[in-house]
């Protein structure tokens, strides 16, 4: 891995214009502090406050993307960095766009035999009663291209599907109805070509939503996950396959649910996960013997163009 002085002047991209701006500011600050404590010449850069071409004008030679959601992990900022010729962390343009789109992610996974919940793409002309009958109740309704479970609803009655669609449609024109899988929430963090130890998530209610992720102090995280060694090995292998199938690289996270029979259902891939000291990827890295500072340097060392 390159030494801290080999990275040149590093821009930590944070903030942005998505609904996840505040979370991104937290991630960016944690990354910035870790890089600086390791001797890297790192500085904050908020694309919502400066034009991207300012990166060249200010002499940046590498970018660590700590943006979340729209414009930050959907291929937009990655495309800008490609045009500028500045190496950046995480996945490229196409993989970022695909991973942000849960519907197309599922289509690719299904084509490769990766298990994912049954789903239907909704619009205002959909027969919502038929959707409830086909997927069963309860079911999940969510924007296809939004993060942090923003706009997500758990629907328990057929009469609630329309309202859930309206809520999700406020965030994205593409809305997904998905079979609800009852079971254990797990996440597999990816670093380079390795899947790190699984993290098990236990929420107070029955849904790992925005409240449970960022506001509740009752959500618990377990690493080791408590899953059998054999099953953990299999899930980590499948998660790495799911990540690669989308063309993802560098680092990321794949979320899944293990149903009561022990079958994993893969939900989505995240190409720019949270990076505060208490986020899931740092938690998995710590279990693998990698400190937060080491993790941030490893991610930066995987930066690329093209």
From Swiss-Prot:
Domain ATP-grasp: start-end pairs: 106-301
An annotated GO cellular component: cytosol
Role, per record: Cell wall formation.
Listed GO biological process terms: cell wall organization; peptidoglycan biosynthetic process; regulation of cell shape
Subcellular location: Cytoplasm
Organism field: Nitrosospira multiformis (strain ATCC 25196 / NCIMB 11849 / C 71)
Binding residues for Mg(2+) 1: 255, 268
Cofactors (names): Mg(2+); Mn(2+)
Assigned keywords, A-Z: ATP-binding, Cell shape, Cell wall biogenesis/degradation, Cytoplasm, Ligase, Magnesium, Manganese, Metal-binding, Nucleotide-binding, Peptidoglycan synthesis
Protein family membership: Belongs to the D-alanine--D-alanine ligase family.
Protein known as: D-alanine--D-alanine ligase
